[in-house]
Each structure stands twice: as C-alpha cells, then as structure tokens.
UniProtKB/Swiss-Prot annotation:
Tissue spec: Highly expressed in shoot apical meristem (SAM) and in young vegetative tissues.
EC number: 2.4.1.-
Region span, Disordered: 547-573
Enzyme class: transferase
Lumenal side, ranges: 82-573
One of the record's GO cellular component terms: Golgi membrane
Organism: Arabidopsis thaliana (Mouse-ear cress)
Lineage per the UniProt record: Eukaryota, Viridiplantae, Streptophyta, Embryophyta, Tracheophyta
Record membrane topology: Single-pass type II membrane protein
Name of the protein in question: O-fucosyltransferase 20
Listed CDD domains: O-FucT_plant
Keywords tagged on the record: Carbohydrate metabolism, Cell wall biogenesis/degradation, Fucose metabolism, Glycoprotein, Glycosyltransferase, Golgi apparatus, Membrane, Signal-anchor, Transferase, Transmembrane, Transmembrane helix
Annotated InterPro entries: FucosylTrfase_pln, GDP-Fuc_O-FucTrfase
Family to which the UniProt record says this protein belongs: Belongs to the glycosyltransferase GT106 family.
Gene Ontology biological process terms in this record: cell wall organization; fucose metabolic process
Gene coding for it: OFUT20
Length: 573
C-alpha cells in the first residue's frame, strides 16, 4: 500500500517539477494501462470485505495501519522539496553526446579527441536531480566563487613615465641614422619574444638604429616564420618611435658593410659592460650583429630602461592581425558560457628531454626519453649532474596530468569548470591526460575549438600555434602553468600588467612530499595544498624584493604604480 501511494505522489509531482529521479525513457516506455496498474489496487472480493470487517476490530491492525500512514507521511515530506533549491544537472541523460556549439557556427573537429562535454549545454525536463548531501549544502556553489575570485591588485596600474633626461636623450638617439644593430633571436616563440625585448634595450643603450630582429629557424620545431608573420610590425615601429629608430632592413649605404659578429655576451651584462665592449666597435664598423642574447642582459637596469622593457613587452609586441583574430575567436568560444581556466601543460617529448625529467608513464617511455637525451646531450638545460629524482624533489620537473588534477581539486576548482589547455601533444598521446579529462570533462585545446580549416594556414608553424595559445591563456580568468618556462613567465607579467589577473604558481617543491605520501587523507592533502598557495595567486609582488627578478614578470614598481604615485609622476613630467 505504501508503494502505490508513493508512486501516485511522484506521478502527481511530475506535472509540476523537473527533478524526477526516474529517467523519462522508462516512464515513456510504460503504457497508460501499465501506469494505472501501478497506481490503482485491484477490486476486493466480498470475501475480502468480510475479512476487513473482522480485521478493523483488531487493535494490532489499527496500530499497524497508523504506522504505515506515519511512514508514508514522512516519506512524502522528505521528497516533496521545493524544486528551486535543487541544482539541476547541466548534462541531461542522453543516448548521444551533443556536439560543440559556438553560437550557430559549425561544429569544431577535435584534434586529440579530449573534449568530453559540450561547451554549450541546456537542461531539460528529464534531467536527473543532483541530491544535496551534507545537510543540503552544495559544496560546488560554496567553493566555486573562491576559485574564480581575483587577487587584490592593491590599486596598481600601468605607468611608464620616463624621466626628462630619457626624453632629452631620445632626441639625439633618434637622429642618429648611421649605426645599426642586427640581432638574431633563437628558441621558441616566447624565448624569441624575450630576446626581442632585450634587443630594443641594447639598441637604446648603444644609441643605434635597430633592424627588425631575425627569427632563427628552431632545430626542434623547424618553424621558418619571420617577424612580421608573428608580430604586428608596423605597430611595433609606431609604439617605439619615441625610443628607438627601427627599420625593416639595412639601408643601401650599409648593405655592403660586413657586420661585426658577437656571440659571447656574458650572462647578466650591465649597460656599462655593453657600452664598454660594443660602443667603439659599432661606431667604427657601423653595423654590429649580436647572437645568443637569451638572458644575457642584466635584469637589474636603471628605471628608464626597465620601463622600456615593459613598453616593448606589454605594448609594442602585439601579435599580427590574423593571429590576433583567430586567438580572440577561440577565446570568445571559451568565454561563451562565462569563466574559464587555462592550463599550460608541458608534457611534450622535448620537454622531458630538456628538463632531465621522466614522464613516469611506463619503462618504455622512460627509455625513449633517456635514449634521446643520450643522443643529444646538448638539449639538457642546466644542472646536468642532478639525477631525475633530485630534480623532481627540487621542483624542477613539470607536473604530470595526475598531479595537476590533484592540485586543481585541492584548490577547489569546480568539476564543471571549462578548461583550455595549451601546449603540444604530450608524450604518450591523449591517454596521458585521462586523469584530467575524467575529473574535468570540459577540457579543450585549440584544435577542439577551431572550425574546420581555421588552423590549416598555420600547419607546421609552431610559433604561430604558441601565439594562439598565448592569446587564449591571457584572456582566461585563471591561469596555471604545469612548469615554469618562458610562456609562463611572459603571461605572469602580462596578466599582472593587465590588473593582476589570477595566476596560480604551483609550489612544486613544497607540494611533492605530500604527493608522495600515500597515507595522507585526501581532505588533509587538499587543505595543506590550498594553504601552500594562498600567497601564489597572482598578487602584486615587488620586483626589487629580490635581485635578478625580471621586470617583464614582476612589473611592480617600475612599470606599475598606485593612483597617488601616478599623479606624482605626471606632476614631475
């Protein structure tokens, strides 16, 4: 009897709310007669009536009936919940997966097949209700705001007020059109970007005109892109017109001049060292060619030169129009449903080779990495005397997919968070990313988001692909790199300059002991890891707090100031 009444109650509520826990496919498969047989008891015979007339006089039957009525009342009260208080599943039960949708655009083709859920999805009346536990509290709703909450920027804003002496020197420097600096930049796109910044500063130090830097073909990626293929050349010239004279090529008067080539610029070279070693030579030969500038110029420069660094990195180096257009489109597709997180995952084969680390997948993959490293020992970057385990414990290795997943869960990233992942194809293929895709199914890269044919013009252009990743990551609400590197450093400074947008720096060295402690309860692990990152969320950090910090990574205080400081600079101008 209790079962039939409870079914009747659910049938009645079905007309009013959409959180019926019975899937609609089952309900629709039942005929009206079948439903009736569930809800209505068969007629009793007269013999049964006589039995009932006897039974109602029995006190035990009365107590039993009262118990059933009370039980039914409690059940009805427990299930008759206000539907507004129930969070509905965003992904209703369905026999087919909905495709990616971008406001009416064609569906995108997935490159690695990693997108598990549609970006755009709507609920329906046959969605199953998500039952709230822990006293009815929805933990996702309580913690989601904390994850997306932006750090306090303390009122710092971009301010590049150059001194009167700098502006005075500019007049004579810009008139000088007889000596030229040629620079060849190497590495990946973000590494080349850093060297272009330093090339502009060195040209300013020498009082020379700068020929648009030459991008050296990378031995790993083989990208033959030129400066104008990646960056907006005319914008680059216009923004720096008051600082350095920039030309696309050597003038005819200097074409036949054999440039003096220099490859041995030391690490952390100061402006005084640059002038002492290069000024006489460029004045005499009129053309100086520099190579191997990566991290050669000192990070600690006079204030005006630091501001020039910021001006180049954050204002002058804008991507070319076609790259910017596609990058903005992909970012818009991620933004369609609100906030999104971007990850820079460093799990490519060359990354494991260069870092001296192992992917930890299978012995076969470890052997692939070790063999490649033995064949090309020059690819290993620094500290070659350290073992893999020593590097791992020192926090020098990229986080694996499982480690990134545990970090995100500890930081209380919502399970339905939309995640854009940047980077090349990981060693081991898409299976390597399964810990992430299982926990966070809305997981996309540029190939998932792009429409058919959109990326074809950039095939085999690693620098262009890196630029597209950069744009989508820069526009995200939260950014997390699995490893340091040039892109992570560039984005840290870019996001700070844009108002200190949230940037989470994984504290790998301090996290690792807890990753390795299998006996630590998950709740304790999450609490500890979250506490380790309270000061690593992209808050303003003074560059001068430690010598050797890059101003394009930490733009405060040389390139950003408070409202009061900005007013003081304007009054001094």
């Amino acid at each position: 009897m209790a079962l039939s009444k409870n079914s009747n109650s659910n049938s009645f509520n079905k007309k009013k709310v959409s959180y019926i826990s019975v899937p609609s496919q089952i309900i629709n498969s039942l005929s009206s007669s079948s439903l009736q047989s569930l809800l209505v008891s068969p007629k009793k015979s007269s013999r049964s009536t006589n039995r009932f007339s006897f039974s109602y006089r029995n006190p035990r039957i009365w107590f039993f009936t009262l118990f059933l009525v009370s039980l039914f009342g409690m059940l009805k009260l427990g299930f008759n919940v206000d539907p507004i208080s129930l969070p509905f599943s965003r992904y209703p039960c369905s026999t087919t997966q909905q495709p990616l949708s971008f406001d009416g655009e064609q569906n995108a083709a997935s490159h690695l097949g990693l997108a598990q859920e549609p970006i755009l999805s709507t609920g329906s009346s046959n969605s199953n209700a998500i039952i709230q536990l822990n006293g009815g509290k929805n933990e996702t709703l309580l913690t989601e705001g904390d994850f997306w909450k932006q750090p306090d920027g303390l009122g710092f804003k971009p301010c590049l007020g150059f001194t009167s002496q700098y502006r005075k020197d500019s007049n004579s420097i810009l008139k000088n059109r007889w000596k030229y600096l040629l620079v060849v930049v190497s590495g990946g796109m973000n590494q080349q970007r850093n060297q272009i910044v330093d090339a502009v500063v060195i040209a300013r130090i020498l009082g020379a005109s700068l020929v648009v830097p030459v991008l050296q073909v990378n031995v790993i990626w083989g990208d033959e892109s030129e400066f104008a293929d990646i960056f907006d050349l005319e914008h680059f010239k216009d923004v720096l017109a008051d600082d350095v004279h920039i030309v696309s090529s050597l003038p005819s008067t200097h074409v036949m001049t054999r440039p003096v080539e220099e490859k041995r610029t030391p690490l952390h070279a100061s402006p005084q060292w640059i002038r002492a070693h290069y000024l006489k030579r460029i004045n005499r030969e009129r053309v100086l060619l520099l190579r191997g500038l990566d991290s050669r110029l000192s990070k600690d420069l006079p204030s005006d030169l630091q501001k020039l660094r910021c001006k180049v990195a954050f204002q002058a180096l804008r991507f070319s129009p076609r790259i910017l257009e596609l990058g903005n489109k992909l970012a818009s597709r991620m933004r369609n449903q609100g906030q999104y997180l971007s990850l820079h995952l460093r799990m490519e084969k060359d990354v494991w080779v260069r870092t001296g680390c192992l992917p930890g997948l299978t012995p076969e993959y470890d052997e692939i990495v070790n063999s490649e490293r033995e064949r090309h020992p020059e690819l290993l970057t620094g500290r070659s005397n350290m073992t893999y385990h020593e590097r791992k414990l020192a926090g020098l290795c990229p986080l694996t997919a499982l480690e990134v997943t545990r970090l995100l869960k500890a930081l209380e990233a919502p399970k339905d968070a939309r995640i854009y992942w940047a980077g090349g194809e990981p060693l081991g293929g898409k299976e390597v990313l399964e810990p992430l895709t299982k926990e966070f199914p809305q997981f996309y890269n540029k190939h998932d988001l792009a429409l058919p044919g959109e990326l074809e013009p950039f095939a085999n252009k690693a620098s262009v692909m890196a630029a597209i990743d950069y744009i989508v990551c820069e526009k995200s609400d939260v950014f997390i790199p699995s490893h340091g590197g040039n892109m992570g450093h560039a984005l840290q400074g870019q996001r700070a300059y844009a108002g200190h947008k949230k940037y989470i720096t994984p504290n790998k060295r301090q996290m690792l002991p807890y990753f390795m402690n299998s006996s630590l309860p998950e709740s304790d692990f999450n609490r500890i890891v979250k506490d380790l990152h309270r000061e690593s969320l992209g808050q303003p950090e003074l560059r001068m707090s430690k010598a050797g910090k890059d101003v394009t990574k930490h733009p405060v205080p040389e390139c950003m100031c408070s409202d009061r400081q900005q007013q003081e600079q304007q009054s001094d101008a």
